[in-house]
UniProtKB/Swiss-Prot annotation:
<dbReference type="GO" id="GO:0008289">
    <property type="term" value="F:lipid binding"/>
</dbReference>
<keyword id="KW-1133">Transmembrane helix</keyword>
<dbReference type="InterPro" id="IPR005953">
    <property type="entry name" value="ATP_synth_csu_bac/chlpt"/>
</dbReference>
<keyword id="KW-0446">Lipid-binding</keyword>
<dbReference type="GO" id="GO:0005886">
    <property type="term" value="C:plasma membrane"/>
</dbReference>
<keyword id="KW-0375">Hydrogen ion transport</keyword>
<dbReference type="InterPro" id="IPR038662">
    <property type="entry name" value="ATP_synth_F0_csu_sf"/>
</dbReference>
<keyword id="KW-0138">CF(0)</keyword>
<dbReference type="GO" id="GO:0045259">
    <property type="term" value="C:proton-transporting ATP synthase complex"/>
</dbReference>
<feature type="transmembrane region" description="Helical">
    <location>
        <begin position="72"/>
        <end position="92"/>
    </location>
</feature>
<dbReference type="InterPro" id="IPR035921">
    <property type="entry name" value="F/V-ATP_Csub_sf"/>
</dbReference>
<comment type="subunit">
    <text>F-type ATPases have 2 components, F(1) - the catalytic core - and F(0) - the membrane proton channel. F(1) has five subunits: alpha(3), beta(3), gamma(1), delta(1), epsilon(1). F(0) has three main subunits: a(1), b(2) and c(10-14). The alpha and beta chains form an alternating ring which encloses part of the gamma chain. F(1) is attached to F(0) by a central stalk formed by the gamma and epsilon chains, while a peripheral stalk is formed by the delta and b chains.</text>
</comment>
<dbReference type="Pfam" id="PF00137">
    <property type="entry name" value="ATP-synt_C"/>
</dbReference>
<keyword id="KW-0813">Transport</keyword>
<dbReference type="GO" id="GO:0046933">
    <property type="term" value="F:proton-transporting ATP synthase activity, rotational mechanism"/>
</dbReference>
<keyword id="KW-0472">Membrane</keyword>
<keyword id="KW-0406">Ion transport</keyword>
Length: 100
């Protein structure tokens, strides 16, 4: 936990030392935290999806192929949410609409 706090504080210091603009530095911090949370949520969702598919296949091996197809569709939808977060993060970092 101490390493994570140290990393966040050091990134905040790096962000605040750039130009002195508060909006830009807050955007960098928010982008990092937002993308990290999106990736964390996506990873948890993918893990739960895979665990449920493995459990379902173990209980009834006959429906394994149907479960795999459904799992891949679900994984694509979960990953799409993380990609949307990445796109929003890149917009906030490089074409920040709050800077005017």
């Amino acid at each position: 936990m101490k390493k994570i706090v140290l990393l966040i504080v050091s990134l905040a210091a790096f962000a605040f030392g750039a130009d002195g603009e508060m909006i830009r530095s807050y955007s960098v911090i928010a982008a990092g935290i937002g993308l990290g949370l999106a990736a964390l949520g996506g990873a948890i969702g993918m893990g739960n999806t895979a665990a449920a598919t493995i459990s379902g296949t173990a209980r009834n091996p006959g429906v394994g192929s149907k479960l795999m197809t459904t799992m891949f569709i679900a994984l694509a939808m979960i990953e799409a949410q993380v990609i949307y977060a990445l796109v929003i993060t890149l917009i906030v970092l490089y074409a920040n609409p709050m800077l005017g």
